[in-house]
Amino acid sequence: MYNHNKIEKKWQKYWLDNKTFKFVDNPNNPKKFYVLDMFPYPSGKGLHVGHPKGYTATDVISRFKRLNGYDVLHPIGWDAFGLPAEQYALETNNHPHTFTQQNIKIFRKQLQMIGFDFDYDKEVDTTDPQFYQWTQWIFVQLYKHNLAEIQDIDVNWCENLGTVLSNEEVVLNDKNERVSERGGHPVVRKPMKQWVLKIVDYADKLLDGLNEVEFSESLKSLQRNWIGKSIGTNVQFKIKDSHLALDVFTTRIDTIYGAQYLVVAPEHPILKSIVSEQQASVVQAYVDQTKKISDLDRIADTNKTGVFSGTYAINPINQEIIPIWVSDYVLMNFATGAVMGVPAHDERDYAFAKKYDLPIKSVIDTKQSLPYTGDGLHINSPMINGLNIEQSQNILNDYLVKNHLAKRVVNYKLRNWIFSRQRYWGEPFPVLFDENNQIKIIEDLPVLLPNLDEFKPSKTGESPLANAQEWLYVEIDGKKYRRETNTMPQWAGSSWYFLAYILKNEDGSYTPLNSEEAKKRFAKWLPVDVYIGGQEHAVLHLLYARFWHRFLYDIGVVPTKEPFYKVINQGMILGENNEKMSKSKGNVINPDDIIASHGADTLRIYEMFMGPLTASLPWSPDGLDAMRKWLDRVYRLYHNLSELEVVEDVNKLNEEIIITYHTLIKNYTKAINEQAFNIAISEMMVFVNVLYKNKVINYKLLDNFLILLSCFAPHLAEELYSLNHSESVCLQKMPIYDEQKIIAQNVTIPIQINGKLKHTINVLRDTNAEQLINLALACEQVKQAIGDQPIKKQIVVVNKIINFVI
C-alpha cells in the first residue's frame, strides 16, 4: 500500500512550483479546447464530495485534450458577491469581504489537494474591482441599447432580509405562508422601483440559439419551457352594462364559441372598476389571500380557487352573456391577465367549471370523454362548423381582426429580469440621479463599492449604501448628483465570467473587454467547448449568461452567438441510502477526510467510476475501498518486479497483451470524448488484469498506460512515471493505437456436425473456406463423428464457423 499523503503533497508542490499547468496560448496551434466548471460560491462550509464530481470530469477532459496537443483553457474562479455571503457575515459579525477572502483561501487549498490542473494565474473573483468594472461596463451598454430601465414593479419583499427576492427564492412554510427560502422570513408583495433588464426582448434569439448548441433535450426543454413562447390572439370582450372592455388572451381562438366564463387575475387593474357592489368584499378578501401565494404555487396542478366578480361580459362572436370570475391561477404578468374559460376543451377550465358548477359546452365533435383537447371538426360554432382547428383559427382570426375585435399576438412566460438588490455586497450601479431624478451614466469605471462597517439592511427598502454619505453624493461641473444605492444581483458576475478568464493576464490585470486584443482572443477561444455544472443552474444562470453573451454578440464584442457549445449537468452524489446529503441527516461527507484516509487519486477515480456522469448515485464506502485497492495494484506493477517478467522488446509480448493494449487506447479515447469516464477506467482495469495474468510487463507499454492513468489519478501516475523519466507525465503525448493490432492474428473456429459442436481448430485469420474444410476433415474427432455417412452440405463462414450436415 503506497503512502498517498506523501506522494500527493510532493506532486502538488511540484506542479505549483514548476507551473506545470500554466495556460498556453500558442498562436500557431489551431487546436484549442475550453473546458469550464460552473465556478463556486465560496461559502463557509467548503467543498463536499459532490463538488469534485464535476471538477474531476472537467479535469479529466482538460488533461486528455492537453495530451492530444490542444491548447487548453481550464480555469477556476469565485462567484463571491451576493446575498449568502452578506447574510453569513451579518450572522457571524464579520465583514463580507474578509469572510469571502478567507473562504476563497480554504476552497483554493481544497482544490489543490485534489490535484486539479487549474492555472491559478487565470483565477477570477467577481468582487475584484478589475473584474466588476466590466460587469458595470456591460450594464452601461445594456442601458445605452434600451435594455435596462427603472420600472415600478410588484416584487417579493422580505423585510427581515431587507431585499427583494426572486420567485425562485420564495417558498411556502407549513402554514402555507410565503417565506424566504433562506431563513424562512415572511415575504410580501410590494410595489418598488427596480432596475429591470429586458431579457424578453431576446426571447426569440434565445429560443433560436438552442438549435445551435449541443445540450441534452431535457435541458433544452427546460429553457424552452421557461421562456414559454405562446402565439395566440387577444380578444376584446365588452363588459355588460359598461363602456369598459376586457382583453383576453387565448391560443385556441377556435374554441371561442365554447367560452362559458372569463377569468381575470386578482391583480388585474380593471377589477376595481367592474366588481359588483355585492361581491366587492368577497373579491377583496380573495385578492388579499392571493398576495400570500407565490406565482409558482398559483399555477401548480392543485385545486383551483376563485370567486365570482358579480359582473358579466359579452362574447364578441355570438353575443352570449358569460360571467367574469377572479382566480389565482391566472397571472397578471403573463399576457393580458385574463383568459376565457372553455371547460369542454381545457383540463384546467374543466376542473374549475366542475368545482363551481359552471356550464360546459362542447364545440369539437368527439366520442372521447371531456375535456377533449385534440383536433377535430367543430360543432355548435356557426362560422366554422365542420372545420378543423387550423382552418377554424384562420377564419376566426381574420374575422375578429378585420372587425377590430382582436389582434394576433406573441406572449412569453419569461419575465424581464429584476436586476437590483437592496443589499450592500454586490456590484454598484454606474448610475447617478440629478435633483429631478434624471439618470446620468458613469463612464469612468469601475465605480468602487465603499467599505462600510455598518451594512445591515434597512426595513424600508433603502439599501445600506444610502448610509455611505461621503460616497453617496457626487458633484460634476457644479451640479450635484446622488448615486444609485441598489446593487446588482449575484447573477451579474456569473453572466460573463467565462469571458473574463480569456481576458485575465498573468500579472493579474484584464485585457479590456471592448479591445481589439479581446476580439483576437475571443476568436480563438469561443465558444466554451464543454461546460459542466449542477442541474440547479440549468435554467436561470444559463439563460442569463446566454442573454448577455447574445447581446455582446449583437454589439460586436464577441464572435459567437452562443457562449457554450456543450453543457452537461452532472448528477448528485447521494448518501449511502440514496438520500440527498444534508447536515440534518448527518450524511455529509467531507472530501478532506477521504483524501486523508484514501488519497485524492482514489476520490477522483472513484467518483468517475461510480456510473454515468449525469446520473445521481449513492456514495459507497466499499466502492471507495475497491478503487484504492486497484490503485495499490497499479503501484505494485512497478514495485513487485520479482513477481513479473520484464520483456524489453514489445514485439516479443504475446498477442493477448498487444491486443488489450491497443484496444485500451482506442476505447479509452472514445470513452473520454463521450464523457463515459467509468468505461475509460474499466478499460484500464482490463489492461492491468491482463498484465498480472501473463506475469509480464513492458516499460514502454506501462509508461503509456501511466499517461492514460494521469488523467484520472495524476499523483500516482507522476510518481511511477518519475521512476524512469525526469519530465512530467502530464505533459506527454497521447499514445496512438494501431487498428490492425487490435485484430487477433489467429482465430478459433468451432466445428459443428448437424449444428452440434464437436471440435475447434485454431487457424490464421482469413483462412479461406476450402482450407478450413480440409483442416476440419483432417481432425480425428470430426472423422469419428462423421464415420461412413455422406456429407450432404458444408456450411462455412470464414473466421466464424464450420458446420457439416450429414
UniProtKB/Swiss-Prot annotation:
GO terms for biological process: leucyl-tRNA aminoacylation. NCBIfam families: leuS_bact. This is Leucine--tRNA ligase. The lineage of its organism: Bacteria, Bacillati, Mycoplasmatota, Mycoplasmoidales, Mycoplasmoidaceae. One of its GO terms (cellular component) is cytosol. Its EC number is 6.1.1.4. A motif ('HIGH' region) lies at residues 40-51. It is found in: Cytoplasm. Pfam families: Anticodon_1, tRNA-synt_1_2, tRNA-synt_1g. InterPro entries: aa-tRNA-synth_I_CS, Leu-tRNA-ligase, Leu_tRNA-synth_edit, M/V/L/I-tRNA-synth_anticd-bd, Methionyl/Leucyl_tRNA_Synth, Rossmann-like_a/b/a_fold, tRNAsynth_Ia_anticodon-bd, Val/Leu/Ile-tRNA-synth_edit. GO terms for molecular function: aminoacyl-tRNA deacylase activity; ATP binding; leucine-tRNA ligase activity. The gene is leuS.
